Amino acid sequence: MARFPITIKGFHKLEQELKHLKYVERLKITTDISTAREFGDLSENAEYKAAKERQLLNDKKIYDLENKLANAEVIEITKINSNSVKFGARVVLLDLDTEKEVVYQIVGEYEADITQNLISIASPIAQALIGKKAGDIIEVITPKGGRFYELLKVQYVDF
């Protein structure tokens, strides 16, 4: 797995998710398996089979999260001093069609959440913004065609 950028907050969120899966979910599933064993014949025991499936899925999630954490490149965005857009930038854009301002922060793909205006570094809008500076006009290609934005401000602050 290739290394990928992530903010400190995103890294801690993945760590918390891993701890929950290992120490809460795993324990609950183990208890469910033990309880299901008490129902008798395991070959026809739906509760046992369901608990074993949940165990398998949980273990896969744990494995995936451990790999993500091992390959994460944690970026402390508040220490970035740049006037051009890179990973971690909070950008203020003016949509040239609607004349509305929008604010996004460019984060890692595992921490992107459009409801919080956190966009993945791999998203089309982030890719169009990388390397740009305040005052630049950006074209973002979407399924509905091109959209144009003016980049008003670039900041490196925590979200």
UniProtKB/Swiss-Prot annotation:
This protein's record includes keyword DNA-binding? yes
GO molecular function, a single term: DNA binding
Classification via InterPro entries = GreA/GreB_C_sf, TF_GreA/GreB_CS, Tscrpt_elong_fac_GreA, Tscrpt_elong_fac_GreA/B, Tscrpt_elong_fac_GreA/B_C, Tscrpt_elong_fac_GreA/B_fam, Tscrpt_elong_fac_GreA/B_N, Tscrpt_elong_fac_GreA/B_N_sf
Keywords, A to Z, come to:
DNA-binding, Transcription, Transcription regulation
Top-level taxon of origin? Bacteria
> Per the UniProt entry, what are the Gene Ontology biological process annotations, in alphabetical order?
DNA-templated transcription elongation; regulation of DNA-templated transcription elongation
Q: By its UniProt entry, which Pfam families does this protein fall under?
A: GreA_GreB, GreA_GreB_N
Q: Which family does it belong to?
A: Belongs to the GreA/GreB family.
- What is this protein for, i.e. what is its function? Necessary for efficient RNA polymerase transcription elongation past template-encoded arresting sites. The arresting sites in DNA have the property of trapping a certain fraction of elongating RNA polymerases that pass through, resulting in locked ternary complexes. Cleavage of the nascent transcript by cleavage factors such as GreA or GreB allows the resumption of elongation from the new 3'terminus. GreA releases sequences of 2 to 3 nucleotides.
Q: Which PANTHER family match?
A: TRANSCRIPTION ELONGATION FACTOR GREA (PTHR30437:SF4)
Give the protein name, as stated in the record.
Answer: Transcription elongation factor GreA
Question: Which organism's genome codes for this protein?
Answer: Orientia tsutsugamushi (strain Boryong) (Rickettsia tsutsugamushi)
